[in-house]
Regions:
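N-terminal, non-cleaved signal-anchor transmembrane helix
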Residues: 1-94, 101, 106
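Alpha-helical membrane-interface segments at transmembrane helix boundaries
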Residues: 79-87, 121-128, 210, 214, ...
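Hydrophobic positions within alpha-helical transmembrane segments of bacterial inner-membrane proteins
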Residues: 93-101, 105, 109, 134, ...
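Cytoplasmic-entry segments and transmembrane alpha-helices of multi-pass inner-membrane transporters
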Residues: 103-137, 166-169
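Generic hydrophobic transmembrane alpha-helix motif, especially the helices
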Residues: 125-159
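Glycine-rich helix-loop "coupling/hinge" segments at transmembrane-helix boundaries
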Residues: 142, 217-254, 273
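Membrane-cytosol interface at the C-terminal ends of specific transmembrane alpha-helices
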Residues: 146-197, 203-212, 263-266
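C-terminal transmembrane helix and the adjacent membrane-cytosol boundary/short C-terminal tail
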Residues: 210, 248-273
Length: 273
């Protein structure tokens, strides 16, 4: 019996046949108290003030109003940064998704029997996944300098970690019968994997990669804040100069671009599944 059940005794009911049934106390009150306590502690630590939020929150609507009508004259200067953002997203997603394949295979326990290798690869994927995209972009700018190269590397790292984790989990759920049959016929593990396992996971792998691409288009748009090029660079500039009408034009173009890419990605993923 758990400590909770010892403190809060279960209700006892005597059935018509004389048997005694127990109904355990609900854990909901305890969960609610813990959540409230953590919430109060968070408010105290962060200095959150709801009054300030209400008072200053109206400025958001002031900025929103300043964005419209947008500055259509600025549209011609948006296309190149938008193209840079899309290039970073596609190239970074492609590189990361391709690099994820061998690491996902090495992390799959039903393919690699060496538990040490599986543990090390999974640990590596977990460590890479903990790095925020902006931090990766910032590090990349110190290595490669300012520009889209840094943004592409940051997106590739994020995609690599995300797709790698998803893929090795998918590989571990496949039917291993064809793989074992290929090995019994004398095929190497690589041959057995490429002919018996990879075709099973390919549709899901492509679907996950496309889903990651959708998010990468949005992430790439803010990488310019750390000098990684793209729309984020001019967004940061317009916010700094308080040119909100031009910022509104940038956001509209970005919104349309993201919606188009998501629609195409969604259609492709439906065909794959």
């Amino acid at each position: 019996m758990s400590l909770y059940d010892r403190l809060f005794k279960p209700r006892r009911y005597t059935l018509p046949n004389g048997a005694v049934a127990e109904e355990k106390r609900s854990r909901a009150p305890l969960v609610i108290l813990i959540v409230l306590a953590l919430g109060a502690l968070s408010v105290h630590i962060t200095g959150f003030d709801f009054g300030v939020l209400v008072k200053k929150g109206s400025k958001f609507f002031d900025i929103l109003a300043a964005m419209f009508p947008p500055n259509t004259g600025y549209l011609s200067k948006i296309w190149q940064p938008l193209w840079d953002t899309i290039k970073m997203s596609f190239l970074g997603s492609f590189i990361g998704a391709v690099l994820a394949i061998p690491f996902a295979v090495a992390a799959a326990s039903n393919i690699v029997t060496n538990r040490v290798v599986v543990f090390i690869v999974r640990l590596f994927l977990s460590l890479v996944r903990t790095l925020p995209t902006l931090v990766c972009a910032l590090i990349a700018t110190y290595i490669f300098g300012l520009g889209t190269m840094a943004g592409t590397c940051a997106i590739a790292v994020f995609t690599f970690a995300y797709v790698g984790k998803q893929l090795f989990e998918i590989i571990e759920t496949v039917d291993m019968g064809p793989y074992e049959a290929m090995e019994a016929l004398g095929a190497t593990r690589l041959q057995a994997f490429t002919t018996a396992v990879f075709p099973q996971v390919l549709p899901t792998y492509l679907s996950v990669s496309l889903f990651c691409l959708e998010g990468n288009v949005r992430y790439a748009s803010i990488l310019g804040y750390v000098g990684a090029g793209g729309l984020g660079l001019i967004m940061n500039e317009k916010i700094g100069w308080r040119e909100y009408d031009s910022l509104g034009m940038i956001l509209i173009v970005l919104f349309v671009a993201v919606m188009v890419i998501e629609a195409i990605s969604h259609a492709l993923r439906k065909k794959l599944t």
